[in-house]
C-alpha cells in the first residue's frame, strides 16, 4: 500500500487491477510463511515448555498437520498463479521475483536447513518484505524505480525485520535449547540490542531524508 501510494504521489499513476494482484501476492507470501512456520515447529517437535508467545495452531491440534500441508500447497499454487498475472503485467523479471519469494516464504521453516534456524531471518525479511515487495509494487505501477522507492523499501523492510528480531529475542533461550542459531542467539544480548536499535532508527532517519528531498 505504501509503495502504491508513493507511485501515485510521484507519478500520478495507479492501476487498480495491478494493485489488486500486487497486494494479493504480498498477502499470500505472508500467510505461507506464517503457516509453514507453525507447521515446521510441530513437524520438528521444536516446541518446549520454556517457549514464550502465542500457542501454535498445529501444536495445539487446532489444525491437523495434513490439513496444514494441504492449505500451504493450495496457497503456493495460488501464489504461482498470481505470479503468472504479474509476469503478464510487468514482464518476465517477475517470474524470478515471484518464484524466489515463494521459495523464501516456504524455506523460512521448511527444507533441510530452514532460514529460521540461521542468523539470516532478519536479512531475508528485509530483502523480500522490504526491497522486493516495495520496489516490485512501485515498478508494476510506473515501470521504473525511484530513489524514494528504494528508501521506502529499506524503511519498511527494517520495520518488518525489527518485528522478527523482537520475536527472536523473546525466544532466544528456547531457540538456543533446540539448536536454532538465530541472530539473537549468535550475537548475544548486548550486540543484538545495538543492531535492533539500528533497525528501529533507520526508518525514521530515511523518512527524514525522503521528507527533505526536493
What does each model-identified segment do?
Residues 3-18, 212:
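Short, hydrophobic transmembrane alpha-helix segments
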Residues 3, 25, 29, 33, ...:
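Alpha-helical transmembrane segments of multipass membrane proteins
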Residues 28-52, 162-184:
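Acidic (Asp/Glu-rich) catalytic motifs at the cytosolic membrane interface
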Residues 12-36, 95-104, 146-166:
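Membrane-embedded alpha-helical segments that form the functional core of polytopic membrane enzymes
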Residues 49-89, 180-214:
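Multi-pass membrane catalytic core of lipid/isoprenoid biosynthesis enzymes
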Residues 1-4, 123-138, 156, 184-189:
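Small-residue-rich segments of transmembrane alpha-helices in multi-pass membrane proteins
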Residues 56-144:
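Intramembrane alpha-helical segments
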Amino acid at each position: 500500500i505504501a509503495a502504491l501510494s508513493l507511485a501515485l504521489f510521484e507519478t500520478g499513476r495507479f492501476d487498480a487491477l495491478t494493485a489488486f494482484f500486487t497486494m494479493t501476492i504480498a498477502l499470500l507470501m505472508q500467510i505461507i510463511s506464517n503457516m509453514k512456520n507453525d507447521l515446521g515447529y510441530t513437524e520438528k517437535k521444536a516446541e518446549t515448555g520454556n517457549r514464550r508467545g502465542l500457542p501454535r495452531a498445529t501444536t495445539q491440534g487446532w489444525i491437523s498437520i495434513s490439513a496444514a500441508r494441504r492449505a500451504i500447497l493450495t496457497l503456493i499454487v495460488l501464489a504461482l498463479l498470481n505470479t503468472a498475472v504479474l509476469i503478464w503485467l510487468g514482464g518476465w523479471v517477475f517470474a524470478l521475483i515471484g518464484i524466489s519469494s515463494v521459495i523464501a516464504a516456504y524455506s523460512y521453516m521448511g527444507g533441510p536447513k530452514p532460514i529460521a534456524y540461521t542468523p539470516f531471518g532478519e536479512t531475508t525479511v528485509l530483502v523480500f518484505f522490504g526491497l522486493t515487495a516495495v520496489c516490485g509494487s512501485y515498478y508494476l505501477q510506473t515501470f521504473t524505480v525511484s530513489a524514494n522507492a528504494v528508501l521506502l523499501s529499506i524503511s519498511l523492510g527494517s520495520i518488518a525485520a525489527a518485528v522478527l528480531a523482537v520475536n527472536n529475542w523473546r525466544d532466544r533461550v528456547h531457540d538456543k535449547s533446540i539448536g536454532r542459531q538465530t541472530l539473537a542467539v549468535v550475537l548475544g544480548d548486548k550486540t543484538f540490542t545495538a543492531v535492533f536499535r539500528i533497525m528501529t532508527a533507520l526508518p525514521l532517519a530515511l523518512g527524514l531524508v525522503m521528507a527533505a528531498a526536493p
